[in-house]
Amino acid sequence: MSRIILLITLFIFGCASQKPIKPNQVVNFDVPEQWEVNISQNLDFDQKWWNIFNDDNLNSFMVEFIDENISLEKAMLNTRKAKQASVIATGSLLPSISISSGVVESEQNTAGIPTVFSALLGQSSDEVTVFTQENYNLSLGTQWEIDLWGKLRQGRIATKQQYLSAKYFEDFLKLSLTAEASKLYFAIIEAEQVLNNASKKLKNAETIFELYSLRYNKGSISIQAYQQSKIIFNATKSDYNNKLLMVNSLKREARLLVKDYPSTEFLVNNNFPKKLPSIPNTLPADIVKRRPDLIAQQYNLLANKALDRQALLTLFPTFSLSGSYGSSSNDLEDLTNEDFSVWNRGLNVFMPVFNAGKLIANKRLAKSNREIAMLDFVNALLTAYKEIESGFESDLTSNKALEIINENIALSENIYN
C-alpha cells in the first residue's frame, strides 16, 4: 500500500504545476525522457486524490488533517508573510505622502535678561515678565527615493520570487504531508491486522501452555517440556504487547497530526481497499520538471539572484526627493491664510564612504546565499529523480514478490488439499 501511495504522490507532484523547468541547464548529465511502467490502468488525479480509495474513514481523516494540521497552517501563514513582504517592497518604489499637524505652547520669562535688553523692553531690571506663546502648524510632506540604479526594483523582484517560492512550497507540503498521512492511515490498518494475528497466536500459545501445565501436574511430561511451553507463551505474550504498543503509537501520531489529544481512539477500516489505483503506463520525465518543490526551489534561486544584484547596487549613491507644504501660525484661525504658508523642497544625495566593510560583507553574503540556493535547487532536482527511480524499482520488486507469494499459496493449497 505504501508503494502505491508513493507512486501516486510522485505522479500528482508532477501534475501540480504547469511551469516546467529545464534540468539540463543546471546539471551536466542526461536525464531520462520517460519511464516505462507495466501498469494497465490509467487514472486522473485531483487534489483530493485519496477519494480513489473509497474509504469514508480515510476521507474524514484527510479532511480534518488539511483543516487542522499545524505544519500546513504554518506554511499558509508563511505564504501570507511573503505576500505582504512583496507588497511592502513594491510600495518602496512609490513616493510616500504624509500629513502632519501639531500645536506647541511655550512660556518664557525675562529673568536673567541683561539690563540693556530690559530697558529696551520698557521694564525695570528688577521686574520679571512672563511671555506665553502658542504655535499651530499643518503640513503635507512627501519623500521619494529615485530608483536610479534599480536597487528597489531588485528588492521587489526578490520579494515576489520569495512569495512564489513560499506558495509552491505550501503546495508541495500539502501534497507531501497528505501522502504521509494516508500512508499512516494504512499503516494503522496493517498494524491492527498484525495485532489480530498476534492475538490469535497468543490465544493458541495460552491454550498449549495450559495443556502442558495440566500434563505436567499429572506427571505426563518432563519439567523441561513444561518450561519450554512457558517460554513460548511468554515470548508470544511479549510479542503481542509490542504489536499493541505499535498500534497505539501509530494512532497517537494520527491524532497529533490533526491537532488533537494523542489518544488511541482512531477509526480505520478493518481491511485494505479491494480496488487499488494505478498510474499511467508511461510517465514522461517532464512531470519531474513541474514538481512544486522544484518550482519553489527555482523561485528561491531567482530571489537570491535578485538579492545579490541588490547588494551590489547598495554601493552606489542614493538620490531622494523631499518636499512639504503647509502653514504655521500663532493663531489657529490663520492656518488657512496664505500669508502664513510655508514650504520646502530638496534633493538629498547619500553616498556611502566608510562603513567598516559592512556593504562589501553584505555583497559577499548575498553571493554565498545565491550559490547555496543553486546547490539546494540541484539537490532537490537529483532527489526528485532518485525518488522516482527508487519508487519504480520498489514497485517492480513488490510485484515480483507478490507473484512469488501467490505461487507459494497455490503450492501450499495443493500440498494440504
Please identify what each model-predicted range represents:
Residues 12-14:
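C-terminal motif of bacterial Sec signal peptides marking the signal peptidase cleavage site
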Residues 58-60, 135-137, 183, 228, ...:
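Transmembrane beta-barrel architecture of outer-membrane proteins
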Residues 203, 222, 241-288:
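Short, solvent-exposed, mixed-charge loop/turn linkers that connect secondary-structure elements
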